[in-house]
Amino acid sequence: MIAADTNVLVRLLTDDDAAQSAIARSLFLAESIWISKTVLLETAWVLRSLYGFDEAAIRGAFGKLLGLKNVEMEGKPSVAAALDLNGRGIELADAMHLSGRPPGATFVSFDKALVRRARRAGVQGVSGPALTQ
């Protein structure tokens, strides 16, 4: 099994370096691949910041990776749930936080926009912190 780093995924998804992209493709064709959540998040950041990918393009690319039989992802069900939430208007990193929480846990954030987006998307158990003194 190969644990892929961000740069391997970026080469695979952008084909921006002919030699490295060919190696990345051959790895994905020949090996079992492990992808961590942190690598996914960093890959999303690189694709958005340096390559101009929008959320839909990133979601589509990650969805294809999820569907590959030889690819295992850390927390695969929560990654799939995060991609669904992302499609409903929640930023990918926030969606990963929401989908990765333990069952029944309330997600608390000072980010009022995130709380509103989560509620609009139908996510239960999301709130701002109760401020007491």
Where are these regions (language model features)?
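Short, well-structured N-terminal submotif of metal-dependent ribonuclease cores
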Residues: 1-35, 50-60, 121-133
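Acidic catalytic patch
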Residues: 37-40, 59-88, 116
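Acidic, PIN/NYN-like endoribonuclease modules and their adjacent C-terminal/linker elements
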Residues: 68, 85, 98-99, 103-133
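Alpha-helix/helix-capping structural signal
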Residues: 7-8, 38, 112-113
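Alpha-helix C-terminal capping segments
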Residues: 24-31, 82-86, 97-104
